[in-house]
Amino acid sequence: MGQPLFAPRSSPGRRRPPWAVLVGLVLVVAFVGVAVGGYALGKRFQQADPWDPFLLRAYLDRPLDTSPPGHGFWIAGYYVDYDSTSLEAVKIRSNHMDQVVIFGYGFDRQGNLIGKDQLLIKGITGKQKRVLLFGNLTNGTFDKDTAHAILTDSRVQDRAVQNIIQTSESLGVAGVQIDFENIPNDDRNAYTAFLKRLKTELSARSMSLSIAAAAKVSDSKTGWGGATDYAAVGQIVDHFYIMAYDEHWRDGEPGPVASLPWVERVIRYATGVMPAQKIVLGVPLYGYEWGTDGKNNRAYGSSRMARRMTETTPQVKWDPVAGENVATYKTSEGDRIAWWPDQRSVDAKLRLAYQYNLRGVALWRLGFEPDDWWNQMGAFRVTPSK
């Protein structure tokens, strides 16, 4: 890279350069382990490779992106602290993004935060684009009892709100995102009231509020996202991120992760009950592989899935209706079937979001995409088209 991987040792009395402090933080994280808050997102993903301190300095030495979010079509992305490729994507490509959602903290059932400090992100992108996520995550799952306690127990809620505000102010972010999933159906009104309270608190501190909501095609009041009242919540929050993926998921029947007809139904319902310009469409950058016997089902990022196909002799087909790849093949585990998106899938969803005048799209998650995808996504952000 034209420079030594490690700088010479500092002379006595000389301040340690900022990147060295951040590398030290990362090394501490590597030894402490992911159990101290580097949890996976519920049912969707496994932990990826650990941090690579040899490469980290190169990214941290790049100029900090301090540009504000754009006024046109947005591209947002989710950053996770347990995968170095996610860090790389933010540092190198944040100039193509309008919001970076930091997959940050869970709660215990008393309203205390679970997770490690997100200080590293300060060296990666500017405050104007940072959004800090808080979810009802306990022991790596979206916990019903945690959600119920925060939404219905005033003392627990007070503690949770205080922790959200203090942590967000300390880190320095433009906004907060709430990702409460698997909420008890009877807590639907309580969830709406909680978001209304939080919106008031955050607005007084010049911070925005967004939520991550499970995809719906009607006002269903049951199921994984039944407690999210799209119409009511859509009037409260600044941005409404819809997780338009897991149409089929790892522990279910094989099928597209997010077929185009299904995604369009999700958009049509949402735009019928809230302003389109509040909606940010979640776009998956991953796929699933299922055993035909229902065993050893797995999730892979798009880059890893493409490599996976080179390890077998698959029959790969592009499904133009679903807008995804489908493949069948054999491994030592038996017959397998996989569905996953590629750049064509992402491009189709960008155009669909723009066609319906949405605020933009959000990528789950940063680090799953091949780097060359950003050429097209960055160009679309500047000059979107239907």
Name the predicted role of every residue range.
Residues 100, 178, 240, 281, ...:
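Conserved, mostly hydrophobic/aromatic
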